[in-house]
Amino acid sequence: MGNFGRVPVGIVGASGYGGVQLVRLLMDHPEIELVYLGGESSVGKSFASLYPHLAHAVKLSIEEVDPEVIARRCEVVFLSMPNGLACQIVPTLLEKGCKVLDLSADYRFRNLTTYTTWYGVERSDRTTADTAIYGLPELYRDRISEAQLVGCPGSYPTASLLALSPLLKQGLIVPETAIVDAKSGTSGGGREAKTYLLLAEADNSLAPYSVVRHRHTPEIEQICSDLAGHEVTVQFTPHLVPIVRGILATVYATLRDPGLVGDDLTTIYTAFYRNSPWVKVCESGIYPQTKWAAGSNLCYIGVEVDPRTGRVIVMSVIDNLIKGQAGQAIQCLNIMMGWDETLGLPKMGFYP
């Protein structure tokens, strides 16, 4: 028997780290009833067998992915699938009236040629893709409120774009000088076994990867171009660090007005995000740490100016699995449903 008045929700791809974050958060959401978990490799297994620590709370099993069945049982569907799979079922889910939030890259791009170039997947759902709204609430809250399909941002783009947006929107920097130096914890690599994520490989080490070819680069550039009003190219370099959760994106760019100081930028950022409950701008001289955000849906931002070089330095930290993935998707759902944007989401981290 369902909970009267609660919205029935399903998750496809519940067995990964993003999926289990969705399960955990949605189980505590006061307006949601989780009624369906779907997947491929884990079909028939109880969710508790995959995550025993949630056995007392989650009694569902992993079912086959059948969009007809999903649509009959769910009003809202979260898709936490590998890239290239969501686009195979989203058109049917939309046709059946479901609201869909896709956590893969399939619906983040306005230009599907760009998607195909970077992800190697040919698409036949251009009409559907044209209806998708990019799910960064701090920039596109009004569009999200009217959306049926949301393409949720990647974790690196979330941290990077929240750092860059005030600078680009207000024309404070030379856009082509923007450099994003980002570090992520190992959970960003997913739950499947990978050599580079083994403790013996990742511990006591810091490693750059996918230099000049990371797939989040065109996603960052797309939104930067939107904000600047012209095409922008960004230098983006990711690094793996030996922590489980967290992203730190440090952004460098040349200021148009070399007379601006750190206090000026802090005031500008505070005003820009005054209506964004999940972004906290640090006081001048305070620089954020990944531990502050771990376990929460918050983004902490610190801003500084180097008068010697005329550059601004912006530091942005998030939990890659919450604000960078599951939490932000639920934030978008809250907006789509007309609920409080903070409903059901963790407001404080695990600290220490």
From Swiss-Prot:
UniProt pathway: Amino-acid biosynthesis; L-arginine biosynthesis; N(2)-acetyl-L-ornithine from L-glutamate: step 3/4
Alphabetical list of InterPro entries matching this protein: AGPR_type-1, NAD(P)-bd_dom_sf, NAGSA_dehydrogenase, Semialdehyde_DH_NAD-bd
Enzyme class: oxidoreductase
Gene, per the UniProt record: argC1
Cystines in this chain: none
Catalysed reaction equations from the record: N-acetyl-L-glutamate 5-semialdehyde + phosphate + NADP(+) = N-acetyl-L-glutamyl 5-phosphate + NADPH + H(+)
Localization, UniProt: Cytoplasm
Record-linked Pfam families: Semialdhyde_dh, Semialdhyde_dhC_1
Gene3D superfamilies: Dihydrodipicolinate Reductase, domain 2 (3.30.360.10), NAD(P)-binding Rossmann-like Domain (3.40.50.720)
Keyword Amino-acid biosynthesis: yes
GO molecular function terms noted in the UniProt entry: N-acetyl-gamma-glutamyl-phosphate reductase activity; NAD binding; NADP+ binding
Main location: cytoplasm
Name of the molecule in the record: N-acetyl-gamma-glutamyl-phosphate reductase 1
Keyword field: Amino-acid biosynthesis, Arginine biosynthesis, Cytoplasm, NADP, Oxidoreductase
UniProt keyword Cell inner membrane present: no
GO cellular component: cytoplasm
Family to which this protein belongs: Belongs to the NAGSA dehydrogenase family. Type 1 subfamily.
EC number(s) recorded for this UniProt protein: 1.2.1.38
Described function: Catalyzes the NADPH-dependent reduction of N-acetyl-5-glutamyl phosphate to yield N-acetyl-L-glutamate 5-semialdehyde.
SMART domains: Semialdhyde_dh (SM00859)
